[in-house]
Amino acid sequence: MASQNPNLAALSAAGVSVWLDDLSRDRLRSGNLQELIDTKSVVGVTTNPSIFQKALSEGHDYDAQVAELAERGADVDATIRTVTTDDVRNACDVLAPRWEASGGVDGRVSIEVDPRLAHETDKTIQQAVELWKIVDRPNLLIKIPATKAGLPAIAAVLAEGISVNVTLIFSVDRHRGVMDAYLTGMEKAAQAGHDLSKIHSVASFFVSRVDTEIDNRLEQIGSAEALALRGQAGVANARLAYAAYQEVFEGDARYQALKERGARVQRPLWASTGVKNPDYSDTLYVTELVAPHTVNTMPEKTLDAVADHGVVKGDSITGTSGDAQQVFDKLEAIGIDLSDVFDVLESEGVEKFEASWKELLDATQAQLDALAK
């Protein structure tokens, strides 16, 4: 039996579920995903439009299936739907033992609704239900963005008994809206007679992009005081989000009533944890965000960095919200418009996923056209 890497095992022991932010057919076929489960404490997988765009554009792992779908007359949307849901279903099966061993907390695989629907509530709900039926695995999570149109969709999808990964959360205010949508959805699910213990949700809070945006603005200000604040906002923001999570899930009467009926907490998930600035430690968004009942989804490069030299000293979040708030107070005092930062990041987040989806559509369409000749 392969042994787990000690740094990642320490992270797991501290209450952080390690998920891989990547999926490809090669990773599934080669046994690499299973290897990461066995040696690097990986207990979940997240995907997004950019990940699938990369997987389908590299190598030839999908060629035979695309050719077969072309022969059957599948259009580009149906082709992408089939190849991505097949990968996700297979990943669900690989992770099923972890799902069973954790009582349904981990062993989860996420698939995102079409990013072009980010501002359309009803179509998001419809597609979430379709994806849930197509993949047909209890350890699936449907990713829905935390846009204003996404919030009612999240509640409606949870009310159907479907597990949800809420993505593209950048601000604590929006995170509060997401937790409210979770409670609303679970209350409706209870009224509809669903087993609440079977419905799972995580709230994916993006970290590194916050630093990238705020650091750029601090550099434009250029004062010594501004430059001294670089690299602090992302972690501070996530720590404030965890404090908000604790308020709701450790004391709120609405949640306590649901808990008595079997509902679990909506765990914070740290996403966008690959460090983009080479001046910062490449494990910054892992070792500084350790707390019970959290998930950290990492690109493989970050996973390897933590395995190699990540220093995990236990809980690094609880009790830090005062210091985190001070960072935000200083940012605002120096002229950083935080609400504008979060609006920009949400718009860019949706646009990036839409652009990746368009690239995926265009590349797959070109492949289908070539096969039709």
Curated annotation (Swiss-Prot):
Enzymatic reactions: D-sedoheptulose 7-phosphate + D-glyceraldehyde 3-phosphate = D-erythrose 4-phosphate + beta-D-fructose 6-phosphate
Positions of transmembrane segments: none
One Gene Ontology term from the biological process aspect of the record: carbohydrate metabolic process
Pathway per the UniProt entry: Carbohydrate degradation; pentose phosphate pathway; D-glyceraldehyde 3-phosphate and beta-D-fructose 6-phosphate from D-ribose 5-phosphate and D-xylulose 5-phosphate (non-oxidative stage): step 2/3
GO-annotated molecular function: transaldolase activity
Transmembrane helix as UniProt keyword: no
Pfam families to which the protein is assigned, alphabetical: TAL_FSA
Keywords: Cytoplasm, Pentose shunt, Schiff base, Transferase
EC number per UniProt: 2.2.1.2
Active-site residues annotated for this sequence: K143
Main function: Transaldolase is important for the balance of metabolites in the pentose-phosphate pathway.
Protein family according to the UniProt entry: Belongs to the transaldolase family. Type 2 subfamily.
Protein's name according to its UniProt entry: Transaldolase
Gene symbol of the encoding locus: tal
